[in-house]
Regions:
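Post-transcriptional modification and biogenesis factors for structured RNAs
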Residues: 3
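Anion-recognition interface
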Residues: 26
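Conserved interaction-surface patches within small, structured recognition/assembly domains
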Residues: 54-64, 72-80, 95
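Active-site helix/loop of acyl-thioester processing domains in fatty-acid/polyketide metabolism
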Residues: 32-50, 194
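Surface-exposed, Lys/Arg-rich phosphate-binding patches that contact polyanionic backbones
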Residues: 21
Length: 194
């Protein structure tokens, strides 16, 4: 399996945002943009892997600016990282007003994809050839994001496992919620995983 460059699978998708894509507020529906992001992530990952890929996680989707009907939405996607069977695809989304030529950055995100073999099980993907400092930085950034995510997940699991209702109720005092049930000593038993 020969290593592949970032450019080998880099994909740019541009689509006109039509009225049927609008939400109740008249802007392009975020769900449509997410669907397009998933499609372009699949195209990039499958081209690099040379096989069918599935979406495993989507990280950091933030809608920075609204997309208007009539604008051209462009999704620029490339492989940022490869593991054994997984790939991280970085996607930058911009929209362009065709009348004014104004381009605005609307989204970016990272899709983790896993390559599947004929048997439906994860299969090895080609190594990624890093041809410049930007590609190297993106690869390293992906490793750092994975590490931070793993640490955050472990911390949240520990917090969940150590739930102490009396202590954790303090957190709720300034929140927008109401507790409308009787709290008793046996309540913590409801939260144990055993």
């Amino acid at each position: 399996m020969d290593p592949r460059t970032v450019q080998f699978s880099r994909t740019k998708l541009t689509e006109l945002m039509i009225p049927s894509f609008a939400n109740f507020g008249g802007k392009v529906h975020g769900g449509l943009i997410l669907s397009l992001m998933d499609k372009v992530a699949y195209a990039v990952a499958s081209k690099h892997a040379g096989t069918y890929c599935v979406t495993v996680t989507v990280d950091g989707v933030e809608f920075l600016q609204p997309v208007e009907v009539g604008e051209l939405l462009t999704l620029d996607a490339a492989v940022h990282y490869v593991g054994n069977s997984s790939l991280v695809v970085g996607i930058k989304v911009t929209s362009e007003n065709v009348k004014t030529n104004e381009v605005k950055h609307t989204n970016n995100s990272y899709f983790t994809m896993v390559a599947k073999g004929e048997d439906g099980k994860p299969t090895k993907v080609p190594e990624l050839v890093l041809e410049d400092i930007t590609e190297m930085r993106r690869f390293v950034d992906a490793i750092k994001r994975m590490k931070v995510k793993k640490e955050a997940n472990a911390k949240m699991q520990k917090e969940h496992d150590e739930f102490i209702m009396v202590d954790d109720m303090e957190m709720l005092k300034d929140q927008r919620c109401k507790i409308e049930f009787k709290v008793d000593d046996d309540f913590n038993d409801l939260f144990s995983d055993t």
